[in-house]
A protein has these predicted regions:
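Active-site recognition of the HExxH zinc-binding catalytic motif
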Residues: 49-61
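Metalloprotease/metallohydrolase-associated module, dominated by Zn2+-dependent proteases
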Residues: 1-46, 62-114
C-alpha cells in the first residue's frame, strides 16, 4: 500500500492503525494531522474502496462541503466500482497516455459566417 497521497495540493500520510479497529471502522480521515488511517485487519479486497472513501472524506473536509455520510459512501463505492471495472482506462489516465476528453481536430477554420 502507498504511504502518502497528494490531495488538493496537500500531502496526506496513509498508514494502518489498530485504533481504527477499536472504533469499529475500517478507515479514518484525520484532517488536523493530514492522515488517513486504515484498519490492518480488513480484507485486501476492501482496501481500495475504503481508501477511496477516506480520500472522498478528505476532499469534502478540505473544500468545506456539507455531505451526508451515506451519500459520500454511495459516491465512493460507485466510483470505486467504475474504476475496478475499467482499470485499463484509469491506468492509462494515470500514466498520461489517454486524455480524458478527446476533441476533434479542426481541418479548416471558417473565415466567414454563413
Amino acid at each position: 500500500m502507498i504511504s502518502q497521497l497528494k490531495i488538493l495540493g496537500l500531502w496526506w500520510s496513509i498508514s494502518t492503525s489498530e485504533s481504527v479497529d477499536t472504533n469499529g471502522n475500517l478507515g479514518e480521515m484525520r484532517s488536523t494531522k493530514l492522515q488517513i488511517a486504515l484498519s490492518p485487519s480488513m480484507a485486501v479486497a476492501q482496501q481500495g474502496e475504503v481508501l477511496l472513501h477516506e480520500i472522498f472524506e478528505a476532499i469534502v473536509c478540505q473544500l468545506g462541503i456539507k455531505l451526508e455520510h451515506s451519500k459520500l459512501q454511495a459516491l465512493s463505492a460507485s466510483l470505486h466500482q467504475v474504476m475496478v471495472d475499467n482499470a485499463e482506462a484509469f491506468s492509462a489516465i494515470g500514466a498520461n497516455e489517454m486524455p480524458i476528453v478527446q476533441l476533434p481536430l479542426l481541418t479548416s477554420i471558417p473565415t466567414s459566417l454563413p
